[in-house]
Amino acid sequence: ISKNLWDISSEEMMKYTRMILEKQHPALENVDQPMFVYVLTMREHGPYELGMENTFNLQMPNLGAKSISALNDYTQRIVALNDAIEGMNNYLHERKKPFVLGYFGDHQVAFDNVVPPKKGDYAQPDYVTQFVVRSNCASQFKQEQCFLDLAFSGGILMNVAGLSADDEFMKANMAMCKLSNGKLEDSSNPAFVNDYRHYLYQTLKIAK
Protein backbone atom coordinates (compact mmCIF):
# COMPACT_ATOMS: atom_id res chain seq x y z
CA ILE A 1 0.00 0.00 0.00
CA SER A 2 1.58 3.28 -1.10
CA LYS A 3 -1.18 5.56 0.19
CA ASN A 4 -0.92 7.64 3.32
CA LEU A 5 -2.82 5.68 5.98
CA TRP A 6 -4.87 8.80 6.79
CA ASP A 7 -6.26 8.75 3.22
CA ILE A 8 -7.38 5.12 3.10
CA SER A 9 -11.11 4.76 3.69
CA SER A 10 -12.47 2.32 6.24
CA GLU A 11 -14.28 0.48 3.45
CA GLU A 12 -10.97 -0.01 1.65
CA MET A 13 -9.46 -1.42 4.85
CA MET A 14 -12.39 -3.85 5.07
CA LYS A 15 -11.64 -4.88 1.47
CA TYR A 16 -8.08 -5.76 2.45
CA THR A 17 -9.43 -7.66 5.46
CA ARG A 18 -11.65 -9.75 3.20
CA MET A 19 -8.65 -10.47 0.97
CA ILE A 20 -6.74 -11.77 3.99
CA LEU A 21 -9.62 -13.96 5.14
CA GLU A 22 -9.95 -15.34 1.62
CA LYS A 23 -6.19 -16.08 1.63
CA GLN A 24 -5.51 -14.05 -1.49
CA HIS A 25 -1.82 -13.80 -0.64
CA PRO A 26 0.62 -16.68 -1.33
CA ALA A 27 1.85 -16.61 2.26
CA LEU A 28 -1.67 -17.49 3.45
CA GLU A 29 -2.46 -20.31 1.04
CA ASN A 30 -1.52 -23.13 3.41
CA VAL A 31 -2.93 -21.61 6.59
CA ASP A 32 -5.47 -24.07 7.96
CA GLN A 33 -5.98 -22.68 11.45
CA PRO A 34 -8.25 -19.89 12.69
CA MET A 35 -6.88 -16.46 11.83
CA PHE A 36 -6.69 -13.38 14.04
CA VAL A 37 -6.74 -10.19 11.96
CA TYR A 38 -6.15 -6.80 13.59
CA VAL A 39 -7.27 -3.86 11.47
CA LEU A 40 -6.45 -0.23 12.20
CA THR A 41 -8.45 2.48 10.43
CA MET A 42 -7.21 6.08 10.44
CA ARG A 43 -9.71 7.84 8.19
CA GLU A 44 -11.73 8.88 11.24
CA HIS A 45 -8.70 10.67 12.68
CA GLY A 46 -8.04 14.38 12.17
CA PRO A 47 -7.22 16.81 10.78
CA TYR A 48 -10.82 17.67 9.93
CA GLU A 49 -12.34 19.99 7.35
CA LEU A 50 -12.86 23.46 8.83
CA GLY A 51 -15.02 24.83 6.03
CA MET A 52 -17.68 22.15 5.79
CA GLU A 53 -21.36 23.07 5.95
CA ASN A 54 -23.35 22.09 9.03
CA THR A 55 -24.83 19.10 7.21
CA PHE A 56 -25.94 17.37 10.40
CA ASN A 57 -27.37 20.56 11.95
CA LEU A 58 -25.12 20.24 15.00
CA GLN A 59 -25.19 22.78 17.81
CA MET A 60 -23.06 23.05 20.94
CA PRO A 61 -22.69 26.29 22.94
CA ASN A 62 -18.96 25.97 23.66
CA LEU A 63 -17.92 25.13 20.08
CA GLY A 64 -17.14 27.76 17.46
CA ALA A 65 -17.95 27.63 13.75
CA LYS A 66 -14.71 25.86 12.84
CA SER A 67 -15.24 23.23 15.51
CA ILE A 68 -18.82 22.66 14.34
CA SER A 69 -17.46 22.21 10.82
CA ALA A 70 -14.86 19.74 12.07
CA LEU A 71 -17.55 17.88 14.01
CA ASN A 72 -19.63 17.53 10.83
CA ASP A 73 -16.61 16.14 8.98
CA TYR A 74 -15.91 13.73 11.84
CA THR A 75 -19.55 12.63 11.91
CA GLN A 76 -19.63 11.84 8.18
CA ARG A 77 -16.47 9.78 8.61
CA ILE A 78 -18.08 7.85 11.47
CA VAL A 79 -21.14 7.22 9.30
CA ALA A 80 -18.84 5.80 6.60
CA LEU A 81 -17.06 3.68 9.22
CA ASN A 82 -20.39 2.33 10.45
CA ASP A 83 -21.36 1.37 6.89
CA ALA A 84 -17.99 -0.40 6.47
CA ILE A 85 -18.41 -2.30 9.75
CA GLU A 86 -21.96 -3.35 8.88
CA GLY A 87 -20.72 -4.54 5.50
CA MET A 88 -17.98 -6.59 7.15
CA ASN A 89 -20.47 -8.07 9.62
CA ASN A 90 -22.77 -9.10 6.76
CA TYR A 91 -19.82 -10.57 4.84
CA LEU A 92 -18.74 -12.65 7.84
CA HIS A 93 -22.26 -14.02 8.29
CA GLU A 94 -22.52 -14.88 4.59
CA ARG A 95 -19.27 -16.90 4.77
CA LYS A 96 -21.03 -19.28 7.18
CA LYS A 97 -17.82 -19.88 9.09
CA PRO A 98 -17.37 -19.26 12.84
CA PHE A 99 -16.25 -15.70 13.54
CA VAL A 100 -15.86 -13.16 16.32
CA LEU A 101 -15.81 -9.51 15.26
CA GLY A 102 -14.70 -6.96 17.82
CA TYR A 103 -14.22 -3.25 17.25
CA PHE A 104 -13.44 -0.22 19.39
CA GLY A 105 -12.38 3.41 19.27
CA ASP A 106 -9.01 4.20 20.82
CA HIS A 107 -9.75 7.66 22.22
CA GLN A 108 -12.23 10.52 22.38
CA VAL A 109 -12.18 13.21 19.73
CA ALA A 110 -11.25 16.89 20.23
CA PHE A 111 -11.86 19.91 17.99
CA ASP A 112 -9.72 23.06 18.21
CA ASN A 113 -8.41 21.64 21.48
CA VAL A 114 -11.99 21.66 22.79
CA VAL A 115 -13.10 18.36 24.28
CA PRO A 116 -16.91 18.09 24.51
CA PRO A 117 -18.18 17.17 28.00
CA LYS A 118 -18.84 13.48 28.60
CA LYS A 119 -21.83 11.86 30.20
CA GLY A 120 -21.40 9.29 32.96
CA ASP A 121 -19.48 9.05 36.20
CA TYR A 122 -16.02 7.92 35.07
CA ALA A 123 -12.64 8.48 36.68
CA GLN A 124 -11.10 9.32 33.29
CA PRO A 125 -14.02 10.27 31.00
CA ASP A 126 -11.84 11.49 28.11
CA TYR A 127 -10.53 7.94 27.66
CA VAL A 128 -13.92 6.22 27.62
CA THR A 129 -14.94 4.79 24.25
CA GLN A 130 -17.03 1.91 22.92
CA PHE A 131 -16.19 -1.78 22.51
CA VAL A 132 -18.56 -3.99 20.52
CA VAL A 133 -18.39 -7.72 19.86
CA ARG A 134 -20.44 -9.64 17.30
CA SER A 135 -20.30 -13.34 16.59
CA ASN A 136 -22.12 -16.28 15.04
CA CYS A 137 -20.61 -18.71 17.57
CA ALA A 138 -22.90 -20.65 19.89
CA SER A 139 -21.34 -19.12 22.98
CA GLN A 140 -22.18 -19.36 26.68
CA PHE A 141 -20.66 -15.92 27.20
CA LYS A 142 -22.60 -13.50 29.38
CA GLN A 143 -21.62 -9.89 29.84
CA GLU A 144 -20.84 -9.38 33.52
CA GLN A 145 -19.40 -5.87 33.47
CA CYS A 146 -20.88 -2.52 32.52
CA PHE A 147 -17.33 -1.17 32.12
CA LEU A 148 -14.32 -2.75 30.47
CA ASP A 149 -10.69 -1.68 30.29
CA LEU A 150 -9.47 -2.41 26.76
CA ALA A 151 -6.57 -4.34 28.30
CA PHE A 152 -9.14 -7.08 28.89
CA SER A 153 -10.62 -7.08 25.37
CA GLY A 154 -8.56 -10.07 24.21
CA GLY A 155 -10.00 -12.25 26.95
CA ILE A 156 -13.53 -11.18 26.05
CA LEU A 157 -12.98 -12.20 22.43
CA MET A 158 -11.69 -15.58 23.59
CA ASN A 159 -14.67 -16.07 25.90
CA VAL A 160 -17.13 -15.28 23.11
CA ALA A 161 -15.29 -17.71 20.83
CA GLY A 162 -15.49 -20.38 23.52
CA LEU A 163 -11.71 -20.59 23.86
CA SER A 164 -9.78 -21.13 27.08
CA ALA A 165 -6.44 -19.53 27.92
CA ASP A 166 -3.38 -21.73 27.39
CA ASP A 167 -0.74 -19.37 28.78
CA GLU A 168 -0.36 -17.90 32.25
CA PHE A 169 -0.63 -14.30 31.06
CA MET A 170 -4.07 -14.75 29.51
CA LYS A 171 -5.23 -16.80 32.49
CA ALA A 172 -4.24 -13.94 34.77
CA ASN A 173 -5.74 -11.35 32.42
CA MET A 174 -9.11 -13.10 32.25
CA ALA A 175 -9.17 -13.72 36.00
CA MET A 176 -8.34 -10.08 36.73
CA CYS A 177 -11.12 -8.92 34.43
CA LYS A 178 -13.62 -10.87 36.50
CA LEU A 179 -12.18 -9.95 39.90
CA SER A 180 -11.91 -6.23 39.13
CA ASN A 181 -15.28 -5.96 37.35
CA GLY A 182 -13.51 -5.04 34.13
CA LYS A 183 -11.61 -2.09 35.59
CA LEU A 184 -7.89 -1.42 35.60
CA GLU A 185 -6.89 2.24 35.28
CA ASP A 186 -10.30 3.18 36.72
CA SER A 187 -10.13 0.70 39.60
CA SER A 188 -10.87 2.03 43.08
CA ASN A 189 -8.34 -0.47 44.49
CA PRO A 190 -4.91 0.60 43.18
CA ALA A 191 -3.11 -1.83 45.52
CA PHE A 192 -4.93 -4.74 43.88
CA VAL A 193 -4.00 -3.44 40.42
CA ASN A 194 -0.37 -3.07 41.47
CA ASP A 195 -0.36 -6.67 42.75
CA TYR A 196 -1.68 -7.79 39.36
CA ARG A 197 1.02 -5.86 37.52
CA HIS A 198 3.69 -7.20 39.87
CA TYR A 199 2.55 -10.73 39.06
CA LEU A 200 2.69 -10.02 35.31
CA TYR A 201 6.06 -8.28 35.22
CA GLN A 202 7.95 -9.76 38.15
CA THR A 203 6.58 -13.31 38.37
CA LEU A 204 5.59 -14.08 34.79
CA LYS A 205 8.14 -11.63 33.35
CA ILE A 206 5.97 -10.90 30.32
CA ALA A 207 8.29 -8.04 29.33
CA LYS A 208 12.03 -7.51 29.61
Task: Describe the function of each predicted region.
Residues I1-K208:
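Solvent-exposed soluble domains appended to multi-pass membrane proteins
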